[in-house]
């Protein structure tokens, strides 16, 4: 059972990793590294914020109705991240549309789906010439012998 769960988890993680293009992953890794160096925390690929370090005694004794400053900062950061993700998704949609247009421009102006039918008259003419050339070669060989 553990093997099955581990396999599923690994497969799921691989699918998530493949879903993001390489450039986006690299950009997210660079941002995470910069945040880690500055001590703010790190961002996972899913866009969730994970704080670094152990919980402090101040946070444990704080009352539930108080809102710590770090929570509001986290909320602002999460909103910024959501906006960035939405912007990246819009850019991705634009590039997909542009790539479809480029593929349509590469298509020939006149569709030649049935190549055999289009080339058949030329092939008949070429076959006829080939047969005449073979006959002439055989005649010249017979005359020499």
From Swiss-Prot:
It is found in: Secreted; Host nucleus. InterPro entries: mRNA_splic_Cwf18-like (IPR013169). Transmembrane segments: none annotated. Residues 1-19 form the signal peptide. A motif (RxLR) lies at residues 27-30. Residues 38-77 are annotated as: Disordered. Keywords: Glycoprotein, Host nucleus, Secreted, Signal, Virulence. The keyword Nucleotidyltransferase does not apply. Belongs to the RxLR effector family. This is Secreted RxLR effector protein 100. It comes from Plasmopara viticola. The gene is RXLR100.
